[in-house]
Each structure stands twice: as C-alpha cells, then as structure tokens.
Amino acid sequence: MVLASSTTSILCMLLPLLMLFHQGLQISDRGSDAHHLLRTLDCRTIALEILVKLPVSGLNNSDDKANLRNSTLRRVNLDEFLKSQEEFDSQDTTDIKSKLQKLKCCIPAAASDSVLPGVYNKDLDDFKKKLRFYVIHLKDLQPVSVSRPPQPTSSSDNFRPMTVEC
C-alpha cells in the first residue's frame, strides 16, 4: 500500500513538470519557425537580372531622364512600370514581371506616392528604354529581409508557389 501511494505521488509531481517542459519546447520551436519565415532579397541582383533582359538603347528625353533618376519617384515609377508591363507585354515575353514585383520590397512607398506623377510609357519599345534607364540608376539598393508564407507540407492539397510578402 505504501509503495502504490509513493509511486502515485511521484507521478503526480512528474506530470506537471513534464507538461511545463513540453510547453517550453513548443515555445522555442515557434521562435525558430519565425526565423525560417524570413529571407533576404538581394535587390541589386534583382535589378541586374532585369537589366540583362532589356536591349541596350538610349533614352533621349531629358524630362524622362530627370523623372526616372528622381529618388522620391522610385516607387511611383516602379508601379507605372508594372502597369505598363501588364499592358504591353501581358505574356511576359521579357520575363521580368516577377522581378519587378520583387523590387517593390526593395523600394519603400512614400506617403505622398498617390499624388505624384509617374513615368508614362507609349509602347513596348518606349517601356523597355525607360525601364533600362530606371534600373541602371538603382545602384544604391540594399538587401532587404522579407517575410514569406509558411511552406506547405507534402500533405497539403492547396499548394501555391512561394510569393514574396513585403
């Protein structure tokens, strides 16, 4: 009888300790999951990848050059390039759409972006000339850490390709 009583009391003490220890492990695991949800985008490399896909051509309009060099208009111009890319090259034959979208993580939006005029692209040729000039002047881009959604497990039915979230 004494043996059963002491075994029960030991088990009653070990159970709460085991539960506390298990919760501590779960908390530290969650912290490491958060680390895995971050990755670094090398913004300069993304800009160079866009640059090599565009033909070498000169941009002559000095107003366009000034607009495209203006650091306060970077995000507005990027948004305009994304719209123009969709309009002029909806099949993404230049294969730059995803890279332009990644650049959105590298170039922060300004509070006054909605009222600023962006670059105007007349056609695909004009778009490529201006985009090339724009990307050449993104020399000071720094790597940024971005979050990404958790990767689906092999049992997931709704697999989606990884998207970058800024």
Curated annotation (Swiss-Prot):
The keyword Ubl conjugation does not apply. Keywords: Cytokine, Disulfide bond, Glycoprotein, Growth factor, Secreted, Signal. Disulfide bonds join 43-106, 105-166. Its main location: secreted. It holds the Pfam family IL3. Glycans are attached at residues 60, 70. Residues 145-166 are annotated as: Disordered. Residues 1-27 form the signal peptide. Belongs to the IL-3 family. This is Interleukin-3.
